[in-house]
């Protein structure tokens, strides 16, 4: 179980979820969060999205949420975990089903969400 702001304790091994790995200061991460928030507002069946934040610089979660018009359940991860999870560079999103990784997305997040979840 992972403790998330806005959601309390969440079992990432249960059900279907998406988990984004974002660096608070990363412009690509901010852009992805903005696009996903817009997509969520336009969709009736957007899946649960949880964010694991790494804080490298001075940007706070509150500032990130204001910049991106987004607010997702979030938790902090340390530098080693962040680099283990992001691959070559952030952002990265994991699609999980029953705790197993169904897909890993490093770009084209909106189209992956639309195709995978048949968003309307």
Residue ranges, per PLM feature:
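Typically the conserved alpha-helix immediately C-terminal to a functionally engaged Cys/Sec
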Residues: 28-43, 108
């Amino acid at each position: 179980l992972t403790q998330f702001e806005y959601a309390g304790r969440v079992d990432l091994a249960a059900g279907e979820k998406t988990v984004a790995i974002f660096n608070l200061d990363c412009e690509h991460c901010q852009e992805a969060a903005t696009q996903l928030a817009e997509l969520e507002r336009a969709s009736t069946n957007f899946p649960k999205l949880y964010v694991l934040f790494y804080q490298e610089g001075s940007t706070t979660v509150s500032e990130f949420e204001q910049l991106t018009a987004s607010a997702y359940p979030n938790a902090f991860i340390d530098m080693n975990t962040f680099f283990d999870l992001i691959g070559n560079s952030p952002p990265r999103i994991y699609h999980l089903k029953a705790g197993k990784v169904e897909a890993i997305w490093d770009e084209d997040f909106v189209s992956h969400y639309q195709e995978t979840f048949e968003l309307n």
